[in-house]
């Protein structure tokens, strides 16, 4: 059944099992030729890893960015092929969206082996969870959402994250736009607030004793 499920059924954080005060940075809706390189530059400058939940059609169009993500030590994860609302999709379409996206990622970079999946818009159903699990993908939501996609201002993004972050938190940020909104991303200023906020957030989190890690491998 393609029925909505409660978020309690989906991984939203990883707790503090190791006592290391881990935090996980994740980026949705890329790779984008204007914005993703800037995000990668900031991550490289601060020597921290992130997980990029990429859209398959964009991975196919920007394989060099997928290769750069992997070369620089980041994880590339599955955000479906075309970013539909999966609650409106039949089981066969969900299957195609998930598996085709993983295939596109591997074609872009054979070293990229997706281990995690995030549903577009954070809308989860029983069919989505079942399809992800069958494909060997751990379903991952988030626990901290500064709504950077709405461009609320750099200070707002930073303050929202720092106010909500806890050990084991999964932070949601964006390095692109979903299909249909590409016109919003015509140059490198489109996600400028996210990039600038990230440059503040990483040292601020570290000063608070948090360690930024890749998402744990559950499969």
Swiss-Prot record:
Alphabetic keyword roster: Cytoplasm, Hydrolase, Metal-binding, Nodulation
GO process annotations (BP): carbohydrate metabolic process
Raises pKa of active site His (site feature) positions: 148
Binding site for a divalent metal cation: 79, 83
Subcellular location field: Cytoplasm
EC number per UniProt: 3.5.1.-
Gene Ontology cellular-component terms listed: cytoplasm; membrane
Molecular functions per Gene Ontology: hydrolase activity, acting on carbon-nitrogen (but not peptide) bonds; metal ion binding
PANTHER family to which the protein is assigned, alphabetical: CHITIN DEACETYLASE 1-RELATED, GLYCOSYL TRANSFERASE-RELATED
Protein name as it appears in the record: Chitooligosaccharide deacetylase
Annotated source species: Bradyrhizobium elkanii
């Amino acid at each position: 059944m393609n029925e909505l499920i409660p978020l309690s059924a989906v991984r939203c954080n990883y707790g503090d099992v190791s006592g290391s005060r881990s935090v996980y940075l994740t980026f949705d809706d890329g790779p984008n030729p204007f914005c993703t390189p800037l995000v990668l530059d900031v991550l490289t400058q601060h020597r921290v890893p992130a997980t990029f939940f990429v859209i398959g059609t964009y991975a196919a169009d920007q394989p060099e960015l997928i290769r750069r993500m992997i070369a620089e030590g980041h994880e590339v994860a599955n955000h479906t092929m075309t970013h539909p609302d999966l609650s409106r999709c039949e089981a066969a379409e969900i299957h195609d969206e998930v598996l085709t996206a993983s295939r596109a990622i591997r074609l872009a970079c054979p070293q990229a082996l997706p281990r995690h999946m995030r549903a577009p818009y954070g809308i989860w159903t029983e069919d989505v969870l079942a399809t992800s699990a069958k494909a060997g993908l751990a379903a991952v939501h988030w626990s901290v959402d500064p709504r950077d996609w709405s461009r609320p201002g750099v200070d707002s993004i930073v303050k929202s994250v720092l106010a909500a972050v806890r050990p084991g938190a999964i932070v949601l940020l964006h390095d692109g736009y979903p299909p249909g909104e590409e016109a919003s991303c015509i140059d490198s200023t489109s996600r400028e607030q996210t990039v600038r906020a990230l440059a503040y957030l990483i040292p601020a989190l570290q000063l608070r004793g948090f360690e930024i890690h890749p998402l744990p491998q559950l499969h």
